[in-house]
Amino acid sequence: TNSQLPISHSQLVENLIERVGLTAEANKRVGQLSKGYRQRVGLAQAMIGDPELLILDEPTTGLDPNQLEDIRTLIREMGKDRTVILSTHILQEVKQMCSRVIIIDHGEIKVDKPICEIENLEETFKQATKNE
């Protein structure tokens, strides 16, 4: 960490590095990190101000299966103490990480309900986004 930062900021950064699983990579430049670790850096940056709301756009795109599960777990963990809005076209991500589904088609909300009320997400998505 940067020794010029006040101790509270230094501790915050260290806590975030640990929380997102970057402790072993902390002294590397971002460009030297894998895509999965770069995603973690982005999540840590988003968390720096301890926001009540976290908006993530396609946070798992391009990750290998191990990285994918790690990021999913991290996002679920972050969602325990804040609202997380996840934008994705990958329905498996919705099933794995979301408690509520909002499907927007051409700027219009077509579906807005808890995921537990949706029997078949794929079919719901098809019906909500079909062109009439």
Residue ranges and their predicted role:
Residues 8-25:
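Conserved ABC ATPase "signature" region
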Residues 29-33:
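Conserved ABC ATPase signature
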Residues 54-58:
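Catalytic Walker B motif of ABC-type/P-loop ATPase nucleotide-binding domains
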Residues 43:
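Hydrophobic anchor residue at the start of the ABC signature
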Residues 48-52:
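A short, proline-enriched helix->beta-strand linker immediately N-terminal to the Walker B motif
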Residues 94-96:
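A short, surface-exposed alpha-helical micro-motif characterized by mixed small hydrophobic
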